[in-house]
């Protein structure tokens, strides 16, 4: 199995070298595709020095297009037969890779989500973000007749072939609901595993806002009845 890790990046000067080191230390990765989404804080200078070393491939967006656009760019460039999405902000711990990959390696699932709500150790998160995550997951379960615990998780791992015939349009944080909706409509098996989680707050650079939840609701409804 060849694992491609896709890391969308926007203004992560303080964390990018740390997360790359943590990913490399897993010794599970064939390639690391870093998509810089128009960073303005010096992140690009760091990436320029790392490109082509230790499995790192850097792709640059000339302007900020959004997380979803960066993930889609990474997916198109990946050569592995299993793809894993890794945020650059240190909220998600690559030491969970082994557990995330196990259901795929054992043939139990084509898609694995790392759930922040299944009991592993985690730093206390912001209350209203937790409520929004729970409500969006509940809404997903109603619309798509499933029993997920964490639709909005950043840790999504999947076999490359599930992308065959799937067109993704999301440019922003609506990637999570669009991807989930299209996976569930195609009846792929999703396996959830518990992960550790160390959430940032806005002072530390957290980018997602509560208004993104309203866009997620619309995305879930839209793709329930189209495509």
Write out the residue ranges for each language-model feature.
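Conserved donor nucleotide-binding strand/loop of the catalytic core
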Residues: 30-33, 44-77
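Acceptor/aglycone-binding surface of glycosyltransferases and processive sugar-polymer synthases
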Residues: 63-77, 82, 94-173, 199-221, ...
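Short beta-strand/loop segment that forms part of the nucleotide-sugar
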Residues: 20, 24, 29-39, 59-61
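Cell-envelope/extracellular polymer assembly enzymes that use nucleotide-activated donors
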Residues: 2-4, 31, 178
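A conserved acidic beta->alpha catalytic loop
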Residues: 36-45, 90
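Acidic helix N-cap motif at the loop->helix transition within catalytic regions
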Residues: 14-18, 41-50
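A conserved hydrophobic helix/loop-capping motif in glycosyltransferases and polysaccharide synthases
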Residues: 3-12, 19, 26, 35
């Amino acid at each position: 199995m060849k694992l491609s890790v896709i890391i969308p990046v926007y203004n992560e000067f303080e964390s990018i070298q740390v997360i790359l080191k943590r990913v490399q230390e897993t010794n599970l990765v064939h390639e690391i595709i870093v998509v810089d989404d128009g960073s303005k804080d010096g992140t690009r200078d760091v990436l320029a020095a790392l490109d082509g070393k230790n499995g790192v491939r850097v792709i640059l967006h000339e302007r900020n297009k959004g997380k979803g656009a960066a993930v889609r760019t990474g997916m198109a460039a990946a050569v592995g037969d299993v793809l894993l999405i890794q945020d650059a902000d240190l909220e998600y711990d690559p030491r969970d890779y082994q557990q995330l990959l196990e259901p795929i390696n054992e043939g139990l699932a084509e898609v694995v989500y790392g759930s922040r709500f299944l009991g592993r150790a985690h730093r206390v998160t912001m209350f209203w973000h937790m409520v929004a995550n729970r409500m969006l997951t509940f809404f997903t379960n109603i619309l798509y007749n499933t029993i997920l615990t964490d639709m909005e998780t950043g840790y999504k791992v999947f076999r490359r072939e599930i992308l065959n015939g799937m067109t993704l349009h999301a440019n922003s944080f609506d990637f999570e609901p669009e991807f989930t909706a299209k996976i569930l409509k195609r009846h792929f098996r999703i396996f959830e595993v518990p992960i550790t989680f160390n959430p940032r707050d806005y002072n530390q650079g957290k980018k997602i806002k509560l208004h993104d939840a309203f866009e997620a609701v619309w995305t879930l409804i839209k793709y329930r009845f189209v495509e």
